[in-house]
């Protein structure tokens, strides 16, 4: 029983790891921030919660954008200012 609790705790802690500041963080269910070169990639990687600069991939409340490599991004921040 304790082993299950410890494994579950590590899994929950690991969900918040992997964020980056270089514009290419890991995908998350609700805070998906992935480099999206085009609409097709956005749809596949962000489950239609995406935004690409080609103008074909726009949804409200999206967290996935085509951003410059030097754009600083933080968890939960929209990089479209």
Curated annotation (Swiss-Prot):
A single Gene Ontology MF term assigned here is: sodium channel inhibitor activity
Q: List each copy of the LCN-type CS-alpha/beta domain by range.
A: 21-81
- A cellular-component GO term for this protein: extracellular region
The record's account of tissue expression is: Expressed by the venom gland.
> Per its UniProt record, what Pfam families does this chain match?
Toxin_3
Signal peptide per UniProt = 1-20
- Enumerate the InterPro entries for this protein: LCN-type_CS_alpha_beta_dom, Scorpion_toxin-like_sf, Scorpion_toxinL/defensin
Which keywords fit this entry according to its UniProt record? Answer: Disulfide bond, Ion channel impairing toxin, Neurotoxin, Secreted, Signal, Toxin, Voltage-gated sodium channel impairing toxin
Where in the cell is the protein located? Secreted
Broad class of where this protein is predominantly found: secreted
Q: Does the keyword Disulfide bond apply?
A: yes
Residue pairs linked by disulfide bridges in the UniProt entry:
32-80, 36-57, 42-62, 46-64
Q: What does the entry's domain section say?
A: Has the structural arrangement of an alpha-helix connected to antiparallel beta-sheets by disulfide bonds (CS-alpha/beta).
Q: Which family does it belong to?
A: Belongs to the long (4 C-C) scorpion toxin superfamily. Sodium channel inhibitor family. Beta subfamily.
The record describes the protein's role as: Alpha toxins bind voltage-independently at site-3 of sodium channels (Nav) and inhibit the inactivation of the activated channels, thereby blocking neuronal transmission. This toxin binds, in vitro, to sodium channels and inhibits the inactivation of the activated channels. Seems not toxic to mice, crickets and sweet-water shrimps.
Q: What is this protein called?
A: Toxin TdNa10
| Annotated source species | Tityus discrepans
């Amino acid at each position: 029983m304790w082993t299950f609790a410890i494994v579950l705790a590590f899994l929950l802690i690991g969900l918040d790891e992997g964020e980056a500041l270089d514009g290419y963080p890991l995908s998350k269910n609700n805070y998906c921030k992935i480099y999206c070169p085009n609409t097709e990639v956005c749809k596949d990687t962000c489950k239609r919660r995406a935004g690409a600069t080609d103008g074909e991939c726009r949804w409200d409340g999206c967290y996935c954008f085509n951003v410059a490599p030097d754009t600083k991004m933080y968890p939960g921040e929209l990089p479209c200012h």
